[in-house]
Design a protein with these regions (language model features):
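Short, conserved active-site loops that position catalytic residues or coordinate cofactors/metal ions
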Residues: 39-54, 79-84, 276-277, 313-328, ...
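CN hydrolase (nitrilase-like) catalytic-core segments centered on the catalytic cysteine
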Residues: 90, 128-129, 318, 326, ...
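Non-cytosolic juxtamembrane linkers/loops
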Residues: 5-8, 245-307, 311, 460-471, ...
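Active-site catalytic loop in hydrolytic enzyme cores
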Residues: 87-94, 140-169, 345, 367-439, ...
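Compositionally biased, intrinsically disordered low-complexity segments enriched
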Residues: 204-228, 563
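Cytoplasmic C-terminal tails of single-pass
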Residues: 561-578
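Membrane-embedded alpha-helical bundles of multi-pass enzymes
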Residues: 2-201, 206, 224, 231-258, ...
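Soluble catalytic regions of membrane-associated enzymes that act on cell-envelope
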Residues: 256-389, 420-424, 430, 434-436, ...
C-alpha cells in the first residue's frame, strides 16, 4: 500500500528520464507560446517570467552546447511565429517565416549562453544578463536589427513598467528575465527539497558509511546526521534565495510606481490634436486612390475646426497627422499643398504632416514636416531608421534571385537629424512608426531637448492584426522611459494620447475617423534612463561576454583533461545529453 503513491510520484520523473529530449523540446515550445501570450492586445504580462522560467529549465544543463541552442531555437519559433504573422498578411508567408526564424536564432544563442552560464554560482543573474545581451544582438544585427518582441514591450500593463524610467527597455527586460530565472531556480531548489530528498539523503548516507567504514557505529551515525543537516540547510537557503530573486524586481517596480510623474505634471502645457483620417482600403494599396488618404485627414481636421468654432473642442496649438497622411508628395503636387494649407488655416494651428517625398535621384524619404498656413512646409523629420525588406531591400540583386518580392520593396533612404522638429514654440521628439522600437530614436530626441514625444504611424498595411497594439505598447514604454507625454497618430488606428506614466488617456478605434484633443504637459527634466542612455545595457553585455568567455575556456580545459566525465544539472531532465 505504501509503495503505490511513491510509484505514482516517480512516474513523471521516469518519463522524463526515458524521453529527455522530447520533454525539453515540448517545454521550450510552450515557453515560447507563454512569451507570446504576454504581449498585447492580451494583458497577460505575468506570463513572460513564467515563459522565461520554463525556457531556462529547458536549456539549462551540462550537456552539449548545441542542445541549448536547439531548445532555444524551438522556444524562439514558438514565440515569434504567432507574434509576427502580420508581416506576411499581404505579401505571403515567406517574409513572416524568414523573419520569425531569424529572430528565433537569437533565442537559440541565448539557450547556448544559458547552458554555459547555468553552471556558475548565482546562475539566475548570469542567465538574465544573457537574455539582455541576446535582445541587444537581435535589436542590432543584421541590417540594423529587429527589436520587436523585446520583453519590455509586453509589460506596458505590468508591475515592471516603472523600471523603464531608471534603465529603459533593457532594464525592464532584464527584470522580467531575472524574475523568470529566479522561478527556475525555485523549481530546481524545490525539486531537490521536495521531489527527491531521499535520493540526496541516501547519497549522503552512503558517502558517510564509506568514509567511516570500520570506525564504529557511533562515529558513523554522528557523521551521517551532520551531513544530512548540512544538506537540508543548503536546500533551505537555496529556496529562500530563489524566492528573494523572484520578488525583488516586481516589488521594486511597484514601489517605484508612485514616483512616476502624474499625467498633468509639467512645466507648462500645450493643446495637441491627433487626427486619424482612416484609409479607403487596407493593405499595400491603401493609397492607390490618388489623394484619398490626404482628403480623409484634411476633412477630419476641418471637422475638428468646426467643433472648435462651436465650442465642442478646445483650440489646438498643434495638430499631428500620421505617417503617410498625405499619400502624394505635397512638395511636387500643388493640389496636395493647397489642401494642407487650407486645413491648417481652418484649424488655426500648424500641422505635422506625414508624406513620402520623392528625391531628385528618384529615391524616396519618409518625412514628417511642419506645415503652416503662412509659409507652408517648414522643419521636418526624415525617418532615420528605415525598415529593411519593406522600405528598402538590402542586397536587392541577391534576393531577386529567390523571390519577386524583391521588386515590391521600396527605395527609401534614411534621413539625418536629431529626431526633433521645432513647432508651435516647442521641441517635439518624433519617432516615425518602426523607429519607436529602437532605443536610440527617442534617446537622440531627448538629447536634443524634446519636451513632448510623438509616434506618427501608418498601420493600414497590416490590416486589423495585433501589430498596432504591439506598437502602442512600445510607445507607452517610451513615455515612461523618458518621462514625457506622447501622442500616437495613426492613419487607421490605433491613435492614442499617452501620459508620462504610461497610462492611456484617450484612444481611438480601428478604421474610424477620429480626432483626439488633449492639454498635455511639457517637461524639461529628464529621467535616470535618459541620462544613463545605453550604459546599463553595455554593462550587461560586457559582463555576459566576460562570463561566457571564462566558462567556455574552463569547459574546454576540463573536457580536454577529463574527456569521459559528464554531469548534469537539475532541471526538466537529468539526462546528461539533453
Amino acid at each position: 500500500m505504501a509503495a503505490e503513491p511513491s510509484g505514482r510520484r516517480s512516474r513523471p520523473a521516469a518519463i522524463a528520464k526515458r524521453h529527455p529530449v522530447l520533454i525539453r523540446a515540448v517545454a521550450a515550445v510552450v515557453a515560447g507560446l507563454l512569451l507570446f501570450g504576454s504581449f498585447p492586445p492580451r494583458p497577460w504580462w505575468f506570463l513572460a517570467p513564467i515563459g522565461i522560467a520554463l525556457l531556462t529549465l529547458s536549456v539549462r544543463g551540462t550537456g552539449k552546447l548545441r542542445g541549448g541552442f536547439g531548445y532555444g531555437l524551438l522556444a524562439g519559433l514558438g514565440f515569434f511565429l504567432p507574434l509576427l504573422p502580420w508581416t506576411g498578411i499581404y505579401v505571403g508567408p515567406v517574409p513572416w517565416l524568414a523573419l520569425s526564424t531569424a529572430c528565433a536564432v537569437y533565442i537559440g544563442l541565448f539557450g547556448l549562453m544559458a547552458r554555459l552560464l547555468g553552471t556558475l554560482p548565482g546562475w539566475p543573474l548570469w542567465i538574465a544578463l544573457a537574455w539582455t545581451t541576446a535582445e541587444w544582438g537581435r535589436s542590432s544585427f543584421p541590417f540594423g536589427g529587429f527589436p520587436w518582441g523585446r520583453l519590455a514591450f509586453g509589460q506596458a500593463d505590468g508591475w515592471f513598467l516603472p523600471l523603464a524610467a531608471y534603465g529603459g527597455a533593457p532594464l525592464v527586460g532584464f527584470a522580467v528575465a531575472l524574475t523568470g530565472t529566479g522561478l527556475a531556480a525555485l523549481v530546481v531548489a524545490l525539486r531537490r527539497t521536495v521531489v527527491a530528498p531521499d535520493e540526496v539523503d541516501r547519497a549522503t548516507t552512503d558517502a558517510g558509511s564509506g568514509a567511516t567504514e570500520g570506525a564504529g557505529s557511533s562515529g558513523s551515525g554522528h557523521s551521517d546526521a551532520a551531513g544530512s543537516e548540512s544538506v537540508h540547510g543548503n536546500r533551505r537557503r537555496a529556496v529562500v534565495t530563489a524566492v528573494l530573486v523572484i520578488v525583488v524586481m516586481p516589488v521594486a517596480g511597484l514601489m517605484l510606481r508612485p514616483a512616476l510623474p502624474a499625467p498633468d505634471d509639467g512645466d507648462s502645457t500645450i493643446t495637441v490634436a491627433a487626427i486619424q483620417g482612416s484609409v479607403p482600403r487596407l493593405g499595400l494599396e491603401f493609397n492607390a486612390q490618388r489623394r484619398a488618404v490626404l482628403d480623409n485627414h484634411a476633412r477630419r481636421t476641418e471637422q475638428l475646426a468646426d467643433d472648435v468654432d462651436a465650442g465642442r473642442a478646445p483650440q489646438p496649438d498643434l495638430v499631428i497627422w500620421p505617417e503617410n497622411s498625405s499619400d502624394i508628395d505635397p512638395l511636387r503636387n500643388t493640389d496636395a499643398a493647397a489642401i494642407i494649407t487650407r486645413a491648417a488655416r481652418r484649424v488655426g494651428a500648424p500641422i505635422l504632416v506625414g508624406a513620402v517625398l520623392v528625391n531628385d535621384d528618384r529615391t524616396t524619404t519618409n518625412s514628417m514636416m511642419v506645415w503652416t498656413e503662412e509659409s507652408g512646409p517648414g522643419p521636418r523629420h526624415d525617418k532615420r531608421i528605415i525598415q529593411p525588406f519593406g522600405e528598402y531591400l538590402p542586397m536587392r540583386g541577391f534576393f531577386r534571385l529567390f523571390s519577386d518580392y524583391a521588386d515590391r520593396a521600396g527605395y527609401f533612404v534614411p534621413g539625418h537629424g536629431d529626431g526633433t522638429v521645432e513647432v508651435a514654440g516647442i521641441d517635439l521628439g518624433v519617432a516615425t512608426c518602426y523607429e519607436v522600437a529602437f532605443d536610440r530614436a527617442f534617446r537622440d530626441s531627448m538629447s536634443a531637448g524634446a519636451e513632448l514625444l510623438t509616434v506618427p504611424t501608418n498601420n493600414a498595411t497590416f490590416g486589423d492584426s495585433e501589430m498596432t497594439y504591439q506598437q502602442l505598447a512600445m510607445s507607452r514604454v517610451r513615455a515612461v522611459e523618458h518621462g514625457r507625454a506622447l501622442v500616437v497618430a495613426a492613419t487607421s488606428g490605433v491613435s492614442a494620447i499617452v501620459a508620462a506614466d504610461g497610462s492611456i488617456q484617450q484612444q481611438t478605434e480601428l478604421f474610424v475617423p477620429a480626432a483626439l484633443v488633449a492639454d498635455l504637459p511639457l517637461r524639461t527634466s529628464t529621467t535616470l534612463a535618459t541620462r544613463l542612455g545605453a550604459a546599463p545595457e553595455w554593462l550587461a553585455i560586457i559582463l555576459t561576454a566576460g562570463a561566457v568567455t571564462a566558462v567556455a575556456i574552463r569547459r574546454r580545459t576540463r573536457h580536454r583533461s577529463e574527456p569521459t566525465e559528464q554531469t548534469s544539472s537539475p532541471g526538466l531532465s537529468s539526462h546528461p545529453s539533453a
